[in-house]
Amino acid sequence: MHLPFPRRKFLKAALTTGAASGLLLTSWGRKVLAAVANPETNRVFSHGVASGDPTHDSVLLWTRISVANSKTVSWELALDSDFARVVQSGSRETGQARDHTVKIIAENLHPGQSYYYRFRADGVVSEPGRTRTLPEGSLARLGLAIASCSNFPFGFFNAYEVIAADPEVDFVLHLGDYIYEYGSDGWGADEGAEIGRVHSPAHEIVGLEDYRQRHAQYKSDVGSRLMHAAHPLICTWDDHESTN
């Protein structure tokens, strides 16, 4: 049975019904939800934004543009979600050789500080991401969300949506199996066929283009986009990143 209510429509409904109440509580969260539901944003940034590998004074920022004719991507890092206090900015060239992705290592940052970032390409601005550097010294608390074994066809990434909306989370620690290499006959294939989440490409991934396509599919999931926009990721690998 196919779901009658697509995830994009769910997000649009969330803006008016409070279905994503955790994100709707903040100005930044409302901007993210509006951007993810915006067709123009999805035309250029259908895989969203992400951050990760934080240190006490740096963090990696990422995006992928979905329009092949746009090669210059600009970025901003700010102390506020309105980007009134931009602390770093720049531009980066991208293209087919790097699958139209952009990676920025923002350096010389303050420990334990929250930042907001966004990208611009083809006249369109991405959803604003929120990230954070690692703290220094003794801590009263640290909020970690733990994720693992994210098999796209086996079900929707609603746990990612919960993580995105949790204000107590500082970082997401993903313990591996961020993707699964299976083809359309692998574990979870029956469930995926039932709910309309079949692996792409349909065969087991073995080459660079296969992996790019599979990662792009996982990054296009709404829950994944919300989680990556909300929190920086600290990742370890397990076996399914390459092969079982």
Show which residues each predicted segment covers.
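N-terminal secretory signal peptides and thylakoid transit peptides that target proteins
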Residues: M1-A19
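C-terminal segment of N-terminal export signals and the immediately downstream linker at the start
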Residues: L3, L25-W62, G143
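Short boundary motifs at domain starts and secondary-structure transition points
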Residues: S51, T133-S138, R225-L226
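Residue-level detector of conserved, well-ordered beta-strand and adjacent loop positions
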Residues: G52, R64, E76-A78, R132, ...
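Short polar catalytic/cofactor-binding loops
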Residues: D53-H56, D82, S150-F152
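Extended acidic/polar, glycine-enriched regions
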Residues: K71-R141, P153-F157, E161-V162
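Active-site neighborhood of divalent metal-dependent phosphoester/pyrophosphate hydrolases
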Residues: L139-A159, A164-N244
